[in-house]
Amino acid sequence: RIHEIRTRFEVLKRDADVDYWRGVAEGGDEASLRQARDTLQATLDDEFAFVAQCNVGGEFLSPDKQARLREIGARRWQRTLDDRIGLSRDELARKPPQAMPLPAEETLLADKPEHRIARPESERIPADNRWGFRMDVPELLYNRGELHNLSISRGTLTAEERYKINEHMVQTIVMLGELPFPRHLRAVPEIAGGHHEKMDGTGYPKRLARDELSPLARMMAIADIFEALTAADRPYKPGKTLSEALSIMAKMRQDQHIDPELFELFLRSGVHHDYAQRFMRAEQVDAVRIEDYL
């Protein structure tokens, strides 16, 4: 949607041109009118560049930057076309019952009621659920508010989007739990569904601590993290080098996110090196000393 917001900036820049020529036609001082137009258009260019950078989410968005975003978003522009035509039935149902009379003044960035998508009761997790899930479920299913999405302090995911991603663990456990595994595979749901748990009990979806997780589930967590960090085929991030991935995982061990004993085994066994040789790109495989990460 950044292109829609860019178009609004274009409208304001065009309005500045119109105001300039109107002022000239009415006998105003051309030099001062030109300076006012050029200053406003330069300001709009700078403000859009800032909004676009917020959309990328490449750095921490401080409270000062969030305040600037709200200030920019408060600029007004005039809409002359009906914003209710051409919508699907569901989208139209989220709109207010009465359309705003045209022309309508809009803010440059908005969090509108129709941006808030309610979460169905069926998608909430009762505290006494039979699987033992302990996850904080956001009130909304989605919040598509423009300021809400641009004001994320770290990254680009809203609380609603992050929950949707994390929810894959819930679905994994629910689905696998319904399958009639033979005796020797009965631990599969726990192994597959526990790789986002942390040793200090702050992970998800059950907030299990180290002693509540099987060794295989703790191994799966290490394998999953290492693969995710080094994967070079993800559209949203480049793959880390071997040394970068191990440095991050060493920090995760210190923070009690992964099992320290199994991480040491992962390093001393050379599994990280074997995996790198088979699955990582040559430019990612740099020299490492395992002693630096123990």
Segments from the language model and where they lie:
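Histidine- and acidic-residue-rich, metal-dependent catalytic cores
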Residues: 1-294
